[in-house]
């Protein structure tokens, strides 16, 4: 049996199942990690995204991918995501967002 709402690819509903947008989310990264494109198991050197780590009370730290350049807030700053989506692959959940903003 499979869940009814599960679909392939990224979804905002999947992200809402894991991350509570009403609770504080903190930035754990001080700089982005570049995601390199691979072809035939070999890196091409082309950067296709940037990843950073975040934390929320009650959750393990999670990584969010940004496909465009965004400004990373300072360490432990409270943040909010624009367009947060998640994708379930096996037992892993992968997140991506369009933008990030610091909450003052």
Give the positions of each predicted feature.
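OB-fold and OB-like single-stranded nucleic-acid-recognition modules
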Residues: 1-104
């Amino acid at each position: 049996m499979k869940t009814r709402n599960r679909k392939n690819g990224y979804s905002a509903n999947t992200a809402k199942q894991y991350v509570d947008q009403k609770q504080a989310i903190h930035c754990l990264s001080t700089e982005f990690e570049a995601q390199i494109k691979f072809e035939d198991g070999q890196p091409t050197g082309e950067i296709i995204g940037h990843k950073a780590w975040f934390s929320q009370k009650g959750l393990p730290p999670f990584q969010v991918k940004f496909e465009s350049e965004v400004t990373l807030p300072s360490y432990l700053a409270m943040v909010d995501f624009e367009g947060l989506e998640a994708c379930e692959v096996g037992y892993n959940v992968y997140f991506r967002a369009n933008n990030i903003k610091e909450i003052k």
